[in-house]
Structure formats: C-alpha cells, structure tokens
Design a protein with these regions (language model features):
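Conserved alpha/beta-hydrolase "acid-adjacent" motif
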Residues: 145-150
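Gly/Ala-rich beta-loop-alpha elbow adjacent to hydrolase catalytic centers
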Residues: 69-78, 143
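Short beta-strand immediately N-terminal to the catalytic nucleophile in serine-hydrolase-like folds
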Residues: 4, 68-70, 95, 138
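Mobile cap/lid helix-loop segments that gate and shape the active-site cleft of serine hydrolases
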Residues: 7, 14, 87-133
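Short beta-strand/loop motif that positions the catalytic acidic residue
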Residues: 130, 136-139, 143
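Alpha/beta-hydrolase-fold serine-hydrolase catalytic core, especially in secreted/extracellular enzymes
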Residues: 156, 160-216
C-alpha cells in the first residue's frame, strides 16, 4: 500500500490520478479537511492515519509493505508523519516537501506556551527516528514554490543517519513536473525508481528506538 498525501489546493482524487496503475500495491490518497488540511499536522495527521487504518481493514494488505509519500504540503506531511510514526512505513518518500513551518515561513514560535505546543511539529528534532527506514527524497531544482534548499538540507541532515537514502533532484524542473509525459504516471510523485524501491522494501518488524519530546 502507498499512502499518498496531496498538496494544498489538490484533493485525493487528483492526487490518485497522478499515478499509473500498479499490480503490486493499492494507492490510497485521502482528501484532507479544509483548504489546507492543517498541513497534514494535528487533525490532518489524524485524517491520514485513519484513512490508512480503514484501507488496512478493507483490503488484503501486508502491513509490512506500507509506504508513505506526498507532494508539496503532502511532502511536508510525509516528513511529519514519517518521523512521528516510523514504525508504520517501510519507505518514506517526500516530493517537493517543506521541512517545517518555521523554516518554510521564517516564523519563530519561541520557547513559551506556543513554542512548546509546536514542538512536535519540528521535523529536524525527530530525524533520527528515520535511521532504520528507506528514505527517498524528490525535488525539482527550479522549484519556486518550495525551494530545493529544503530537500538539500534534509539530504545533508539524513546522510549520516539513514543508511538507505536516495536523493533525486530533477534538473530544471519546477514544483510539479513530469519527465516522461507519454508514460502513465507523473514523475514527481510516481518516479519509476522510487516505485521500484517501494515494491522491494519490506518493513522490518523489529522494535524501534525512537525519540519523543515532551511539551512540558
């Protein structure tokens, strides 16, 4: 199963139509609530996980072959959900994903109550949770919506942590791109090499060591 999170202004149906038909996986693309879906944080994160649980209960799916991806806001959601629930996904594959709100917007939530409430949303504080996972990062080098610096920073941060890390930066590509328009599937979300990794990777059921941060 591939859980795919849409970007702002996109719904699940549009997201699903960006994928080619696959004989080895279901593509589950939920539509989040409200125009920006809480950036797949808080209630948005709950929506994603509840959709996953429904799919697992409805279809005959191997829970060791569940993967997570998304584009733009959904790429951020992939980072956030991935570092928060690393035990659920074999491959974590953000495309054009921003890291977190402070880095993306320049906001500073400080260390008071507001900052403590936002602590679980700081992706970089939890990246070590991805150590045993397969991570596949996709970004266009000419993306003027989510700068490629986000992907490059995550690659640099994860290189000493994640053994199975792939970084694909498409030269000259913008925010949404397809290098092979005559072939089914949109490459920025349905890149063949990434799909081959998902098809082959199985989630290791061994217990994980992971990091949590208390808001107190």
């Amino acid at each position: 199963l591939i859980l795919s999170l849409h970007g702002a202004g996109v719904n699940g149906l549009g997201q699903a139509r960006s994928y080619s038909t696959k004989d080895w996986a279901w593509v589950v693309a939920p539509t989040n609530r409200r125009p920006f879906g809480y950036d797949w944080e808080t209630f948005g994160r709950m929506d994603a996980l509840e959709s996953l649980e429904y799919a697992l209960a409805t279809f005959d799916i191997d829970p060791q072959r569940v993967h997570l991806t998304g584009h733009s806001m959904g790429g951020h959601g992939t980072w956030h959900v991935g570092v928060s629930y690393p035990h659920r996904f074999g491959v974590i594959a953000p495309s054009a994903g921003w890291i977190d709100r402070e880095i993306y917007t320049g906001a500073n939530f400080g260390t008071g109550p507001w900052g403590r409430a936002k602590a679980p949303l700081k992706t970089l504080d939890f990246v070590e949770n991805l150590a045993p996972r397969t991570v596949y990062i996709i970004h266009g080098s000419a993306d003027n919506n989510v700068p490629p610096s986000h992907a490059r920073q995550m690659e640099q941060t994860l290189t000493p942590i994640v053994a199975d890390l792939t970084y694909h930066e498409e030269a000259g590509a913008g925010h949404w791109w397809d290098a092979s328009p005559d072939v089914p599937g949109t490459d920025c979300v349905d890149l063949p090499d990434m799909m081959q990794r998902m098809e082959s990777v199985r989630l290791d059921p061994a217990p994980l060591a992971f990091r949590v941060i208390s808001a107190g």
